[in-house]
């Protein structure tokens, strides 16, 4: 799963136009976990790809009319079945965090990687999603070691606006999978 010029080899690539360059000499040092479902609470359709590529049809669902104007992206999406979709290379700045602050640092998009989990705040995430998120995180830590100590939810960097990944996300389970996997690789 090693990155190929910022792309995961095993991910399905759906390049987004919604990204730009990070500030000079800025390497990713933060992982931000998000959730998304389009329409809200529905899974498996083409709508997340459409949102992140700027091609969502505002007439396809009433909710889409509210979001069709957005220019947003994440680096990756992990679907319910564990499929990884990548929209933006990791060395580029995806537009996932918005107005944000992490430990006193503003503009989290400048120094973070955003990974979306297909889901909602209150529905349990799947085992496949945890396994893939841990695998991607290990890969990221190998290239960007500071991420090991800086993993958070969207809700923690934008607490007045966002709630994801929500109470359904099992942080201890995720951190244990990352640690267990990292330990296996060292032995």
From Swiss-Prot:
The species this protein was found in: Salmonella typhimurium (strain LT2 / SGSC1412 / ATCC 700720)
Residue runs in coiled coils: none
Statement: the UniProt record of this protein carries the keyword Cell wall biogenesis/degradation: yes
GO molecular function: metal ion binding; N-acetylmuramoyl-L-alanine amidase activity
Gene encoding the protein: ampD
Localization (cell): Cytoplasm
Matching InterPro entries: Amidase/PGRP_sf, Amidase_domain, NAMLAA_amidase_2
Family annotation (Gene3D superfamilies): Peptidoglycan recognition protein-like
Record's signal peptide: none
Domain of life: Bacteria
CDD domains the record matches: PGRP (cd06583)
Reaction catalyzed: Hydrolyzes the link between N-acetylmuramoyl residues and L-amino acid residues in certain cell-wall glycopeptides
Role noted for this protein: Involved in cell wall peptidoglycan recycling. Specifically cleaves the amide bond between the lactyl group of N-acetylmuramic acid and the alpha-amino group of the L-alanine in degradation products containing an anhydro N-acetylmuramyl moiety.
Family: Belongs to the N-acetylmuramoyl-L-alanine amidase 2 family.
Ligand binding (Zn(2+)): 34, 154, 164
Its EC number(s): 3.5.1.28
Cofactor, free-text remark: Zn(2+) is required for amidase activity.
Class of the enzyme per the UniProt entry, highest EC level: hydrolase
Protein name: 1,6-anhydro-N-acetylmuramyl-L-alanine amidase AmpD
Annotated N-acetylmuramoyl-L-alanine amidase domain residues: 29-167
Cofactor requirements of the protein: Zn(2+)
Entry GO CC: cytoplasm
Keywords: Cell wall biogenesis/degradation, Cytoplasm, Hydrolase, Metal-binding, Zinc
């Amino acid at each position: 799963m090693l990155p190929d010029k910022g792309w995961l080899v095993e991910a399905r690539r759906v390049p987004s136009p919604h990204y730009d360059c990070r500030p000079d000499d800025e390497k990713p040092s933060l992982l931000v976990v998000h959730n998304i479902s389009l329409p809200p609470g529905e899974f498996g359709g083409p709508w997340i790809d459409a949102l992140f590529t700027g091609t969502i049809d505002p007439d396809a669902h009433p909710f889409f009319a509210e979001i069709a104007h957005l220019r947003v992206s994440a680096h990756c999406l992990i679907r319910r079945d564990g499929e990884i979709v990548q929209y933006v290379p990791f060395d580029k700045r995806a537009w996932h965090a918005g107005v944000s602050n992490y430990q006193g640092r503003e503009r989290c998009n400048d120094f973070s990687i955003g990974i979306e989990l297909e889901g909602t705040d209150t529905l349990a995430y799947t085992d496949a999603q945890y396994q893939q998120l841990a695998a991607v995180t290990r890969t990221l830590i190998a290239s960007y070691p500071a991420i090991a100590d800086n993993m958070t939810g969207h809700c923690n960097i934008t607490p007045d606006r966002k709630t994801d990944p929500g109470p359904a996300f099992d942080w201890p389970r995720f951190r244990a999978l990352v640690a267990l996997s990292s330990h296996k690789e060292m032995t």
